[in-house]
């Protein structure tokens, strides 16, 4: 790929200061600059360092435009990271990734509806009565169960499993090895024997969501496990049966959410958070890494720790821990003194 800075400005929406005909071929990082590549600084206070960085162009915050002086090629943008992201999308789309069409080794069942311009990779299995929307890409070794619906512009990477009767809406990305619609962990104890409860619901993943590699989302016991619009789920995450995740939430790696829990809109669960079942987490809640959530959390709270509590309160408790043994000794000493009076 090769584009001029004039074209790059059209992509990023920024304002150029420099040679509009200069050619860019790739993105680069600040730590590994290239003379024909573009990088960015989100923090304007660090922009002075570009004098020693040999990159072809820099995207910098608009707020420093009036005071910042340099002879380097610079694009000023209100949000440099977003401008750089727009360029990355353009760069990524220019690279060939797959051949359109159905590979001859793919297995296509009866009454399958294939949209326009789709891709089904080698050794993938599409069972009966499946619908695949326009421009959807199914990479090799993917399994899609009967009566499943996959919308437009979706990408399912290698070794993804989507079991029967699930609904994947438009522009959903499912990373390699993820499993959608596995049986929920449901058993009833009868005479000291765990009897399996059939899980007859499904999973619905709403539009513009992304599911990380090797993540598992269980089908509902009845009704649906629901992943809302524009939800981002990281790798190695477990979402149990009948969980509901609200629009725009982010769930980071190794989180486990037990059954029938409801997560509101715009929630952030950091890495390795554990969530008990049958609880409600309100809109906009943020929970720090490795926290244990065992009760409802009202909207807008920032929480941390196990058991989870107010973020600042937890930090104060952690700060006090190194002195706890000394405090206990002092308490016992004073108590003994009082008793001997």
Curated annotation (Swiss-Prot):
One of the GO biological process terms: lipid A biosynthetic process
Transferase in keyword set: yes
Concerning InterPro entries, the annotation shows: Hexapep (IPR001451), Hexapep_transf_CS (IPR018357), LpxD (IPR007691), Trimer_LpxA-like_sf (IPR011004), UDP_GlcNAc_AcTrfase_non-rep (IPR020573)
- What pathway is this protein said to act in by its record? Bacterial outer membrane biogenesis; LPS lipid A biosynthesis
Taxonomic superkingdom: Bacteria
- Where in the sequence is the active site? 241 (proton acceptor)
- Which GO terms label this protein's molecular function in UniProt? N-acyltransferase activity
Using the chain's own numbering, where are the disulfide bonds? none
Q: Which Pfam family is an annotated match for this chain, by its short name?
A: Hexapep
**What keywords tag this UniProt record?**
Acyltransferase, Lipid A biosynthesis, Lipid biosynthesis, Lipid metabolism, Repeat, Transferase
Described purpose of this protein according to its UniProt entry: Catalyzes the N-acylation of UDP-3-O-acylglucosamine using 3-hydroxyacyl-ACP as the acyl donor. Is involved in the biosynthesis of lipid A, a phosphorylated glycolipid that anchors the lipopolysaccharide to the outer membrane of the cell.
This protein's assembly is summarised as: Homotrimer.
Under what name is this protein listed? UDP-3-O-acylglucosamine N-acyltransferase
Q: Which organism is it from?
A: Elusimicrobium minutum (strain Pei191)
């Amino acid at each position: 790929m090769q584009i001029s800075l004039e074209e790059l400005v059209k992509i990023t929406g920024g304002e150029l200061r420099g040679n509009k005909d200069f050619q860019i071929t790739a993105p680069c990082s600040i730590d590994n600059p290239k003379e024909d590549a573009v990088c960015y600084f989100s923090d304007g206070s660090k922009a002075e360092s570009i004098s020693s960085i040999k990159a072809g162009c820099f995207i910098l915050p608009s707020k420093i435009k009036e005071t910042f002086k340099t002879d380097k090629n610079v694009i000023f943008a209100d949000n440099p990271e977003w401008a750089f992201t727009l360029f990355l999308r353009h760069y990524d789309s220019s690279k060939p990734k797959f051949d359109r069409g159905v590979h001859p080794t793919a297995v296509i069942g009866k009454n399958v509806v294939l949209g326009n311009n789709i891709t089904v990779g080698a050794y993938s299995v599409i069972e009966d009565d499946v619908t695949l929307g326009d421009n959807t890409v199914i990479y090799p070794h993917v399994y899609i169960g009967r009566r499943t619906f996959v919308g437009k512009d979706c990408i399912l990477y290698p070794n993804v499993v989507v079991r029967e009767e699930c609904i994947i809406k438009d522009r959903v990305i499912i990373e390699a090895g993820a499993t959608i619609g596995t049986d929920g962990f449901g058993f009833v104890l009868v005479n000291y024997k765990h009897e399996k409860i059939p899980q007859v619901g499904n999973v619905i993943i709403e539009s513009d969501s992304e599911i990380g590699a090797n993540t598992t989302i269980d089908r509902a016991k009845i009704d649906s496990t629901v992943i809302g619009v524009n939800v981002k789920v990281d790798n190695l995450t477990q979402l149990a049966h009948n969980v509901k995740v609200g629009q725009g939430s982010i769930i980071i790696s190794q989180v486990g959410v037990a059954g029938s829990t409801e997560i509101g809109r715009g929630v952030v669960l950091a890495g390795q958070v554990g969530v008990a079942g049958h609880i409600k987490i309100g809109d906009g809640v943020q929970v720090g890494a490795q926290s244990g959530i065992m009760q409802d959390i009202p909207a807008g709270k920032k929480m941390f720790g196990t058991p989870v509590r107010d973020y600042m309160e937890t930090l104060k408790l952690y700060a006090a821990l190194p002195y706890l043994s000394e405090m206990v000794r002092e308490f016992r000493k004073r108590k003994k003194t009082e008793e001997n009076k």
